[in-house]
Amino acid sequence: MAVAVCHFRLGPEVWNTASMEMPKVKQDMPPPGGYGPIDYKRNLPRRGLSGYSMLAIGIGTLVYGHWSIMKWNRERRRLQIEDFEARIALMPLFQAETDRRTLQMLRENLEEEAIIMKDVPDWKVGESVFHTTRWVPPLIGELYGLRTTEETIHANYGFMWYT
């Protein structure tokens, strides 16, 4: 057996108990004079800064960034000039060291050439192959011809950490 559940409750003014008719529903009516105006526009609160203030902040950021870049470029240029001056001052020392190392290697090569070619008649140790009286800087192969392969590779390619 099903039990009916009433989802709404009608008051005694609506329920007519004498005739047991269908209840009459009281209809709500607007108040006298009608309802007031309804505000239907979107009313969102302001969020964040205004456009002008964001534009001002953006321009200020750009100006500050430009100023800091200019300042750093001036400092970098000053440091670069200092490095160039130090390099120019040390260049004669480096050139003298390179010349000393080259002459030492040429002397060692001449000694090795004298040992290797001692049995060859009419061989002049240290004779120039260029037939000139001017100084010609020796080539890498000429300097490192009698050296080990590792020394030649190091002279040609410099320091290689992966070998």
Curated annotation (Swiss-Prot):
GO cellular component entries: cytoplasm; mitochondrial inner membrane; mitochondrial membrane; mitochondrion; nucleoplasm; respiratory chain complex; respiratory chain complex I
Keyword field: Electron transport, Membrane, Mitochondrion, Mitochondrion inner membrane, Nucleus, Respiratory chain, Transmembrane, Transmembrane helix, Transport
Subcellular location: Mitochondrion inner membrane; Nucleus
A biological process term (GO) from this entry: negative regulation of DNA-templated transcription
Pfam families assigned: GRIM-19
InterPro entries recorded: GRIM-19
Top-level taxon: Eukaryota
Transmembrane as UniProt keyword: yes
Topological category with respect to the lipid bilayer: Single-pass membrane protein
Subunit text: Complex I is composed of 45 different subunits. Interacts with CARD15, but not with CARD4. Interacts with STAT3, but not with STAT1, STAT2 and STAT5A. Interacts with OLFM4.
Function, in words: Accessory subunit of the mitochondrial membrane respiratory chain NADH dehydrogenase (Complex I), that is believed not to be involved in catalysis. Complex I functions in the transfer of electrons from NADH to the respiratory chain. The immediate electron acceptor for the enzyme is believed to be ubiquinone. Involved in the interferon/all-trans-retinoic acid (IFN/RA) induced cell death. This apoptotic activity is inhibited by interaction with viral IRF1. Prevents the transactivation of STAT3 target genes.
Membership in a protein family: Belongs to the complex I NDUFA13 subunit family.
Protein name: NADH dehydrogenase [ubiquinone] 1 alpha subcomplex subunit 13
